[in-house]
């Protein structure tokens, strides 16, 4: 007979997103604790700007993470909405379907992270799979979009994000790390392509992959583009965090900030 070890993990149920190692220099996962701090700040700012309204009890608010990796922001948003909408939508399955199909959206940064984000949000890498908690999707992607994008090379760098051609022009077998949200001249058309219709968002929140190796090109060009596009697809009457309409983003202190994102101090430790 086997004897029970002196130590035990019985009763411990760790959050799997605290246990996953980072994958690459732009796939550094946001800790759930930090994501929740950002969401707390967001909810407080929303209440201040909307006469004390509870963000998590509003079934009309739409959220977007334009650079989702582990899906932690989307998962925690969905969890808060599930609690906040319990009175207005008492049936749990109806409530979950409403939140996941009409309120929470993401854009994966790589194929692998898009699957991980779907697993975090839908409990299945296939949004329409038999194990998915959402029952209203016809596609495997659900509301977390990913398709391979290509950089537009100009003088050795990407015209949109500044990434180094020497570093990332490496063939079809490897990820390009070209993010759909910023590799476009028309963000409204891109959002319509991804999610359909005249889609706009009330909250755009995420942790951009500032660690991406861009061959020494640390001017923050793509961050400025990200912030500009956030403004373009956000509703006008929405929360502002550190001067960025509807966008809760953060950047590390060493980054210089171009004129287009001069207000984006972000939420930092």
Q: Which sequence ranges carry the predicted segments?
A:
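SAM-dependent methyltransferase catalytic region
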Residues: 2-269
